[in-house]
Each structure stands twice: as structure tokens, then as C-alpha cells.
């Protein structure tokens, strides 16, 4: 799991480069998964597309999950991720997994599957033509702080959401969304509300 601070912080942009992702890929064990955080708020669309393009240049099997309105998790493996989605349901009965997920409001597999936002083809389309970030061209380190007050979160949310149509979702995700009850959607809403709640670490 790579959840650095925002890329406008000095030195953090190096954790969004091709070299960083290549290093992560080299260390993945068979069946291992990388989860890379990104965000849609206070960032230009150009920079967000570059982050996605850089990630998919190393992990072409990458997928995207929206954990709330502003946070994106890009999840990838050495093997295609979409065929692994069924593991979410089959492994849910593990006490440790279910307990940990319940702490963040995910009570059943639908809660997690409903967060799926984009598959490899959609991510590739979103990042098409964007600059691939590398250690020799650390553009993000300079563009990110410059765009903090210029970027439109609403525009980024809309453009990112537009890359996936319902019919393009994996069959498992699509079928679970089609069959979801009102109670399940309310449970999802509760989970999303919980994801927006936070406390200062040193207050605990």
C-alpha cells in the first residue's frame, strides 16, 4: 500500500514516478497486489492524468476504485485483477478480513465491489497522451503546488467518473449493483460517510 502525502509536498512527487512503480513491481510476490492512492481534489486534470498514465505504464492490468468523492485507489498485480474480484466474496468469511473491513463500515462484499470505478481499458483511455512521470522529469513536483488553488475538484470528479459506463463494469460488479437492495445502498452510503470522517492521530 502506497499512500504518500499529497504531491505538492516537497519530495513526495518521487513516489508517483515510473521508477517508483517499477521498484514496487520488482518486489511483488506472485499473487501480490499494489494499492496506490491518488486524489482528485486540488490537482489539475493534467497532473491526475499523468499519475494514472505513469501507473498504467508499469501496471497495465491496473484498476481504479473510488473510496469517496475525492480519493482514488489504483490496484494492480502482476496478473489481471478483474478475475480476482470473486475473491472478495469467497474470502469474506475470514474473521480477520471481515472484522477489519467492518471497522471502516464495509459490512458485506457489495460495499467493496460497489467502489470499483475503472478497469484497465478505461484507465488506459483516461491516461492516453499524458506525460509519464520519471525521475529525470519531475514535473509533478513543480506543477502540483502551483495548481493547488487553480484546480477544480468538481471537474476532475466528473472527468474521472465519465471514463466508465455501467455496461463496461466487470460482470460481477455489474450484477451485484443491479441486484442491490435499498438497504444495501443505504449501508454503502453509511460506509462512504464514515470514509469522510477523520480524527487527528495524536488525539487518540
Region annotations inferred by a language model:
Residues 21, 44-66:
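Conserved Class I S-adenosyl-L-methionine
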Residues 6-16:
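Glycine/threonine-rich flexible loop motifs
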Residues 16-30:
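A short glycine-rich, Lys/Arg-flanked "PGG" loop and its adjoining helix->strand segment in the class I
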Residues 5-7, 39-43:
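Short "lid" loop at the C-terminus of a central beta-strand within the Rossmann-like core
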Residues 1-2:
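A short beta-strand submotif of the Rossmann-like class I SAM-dependent methyltransferase core
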Residues 42, 63-204:
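Soluble small-group transferase modules, centered on the S-adenosyl donor enzyme superfamily
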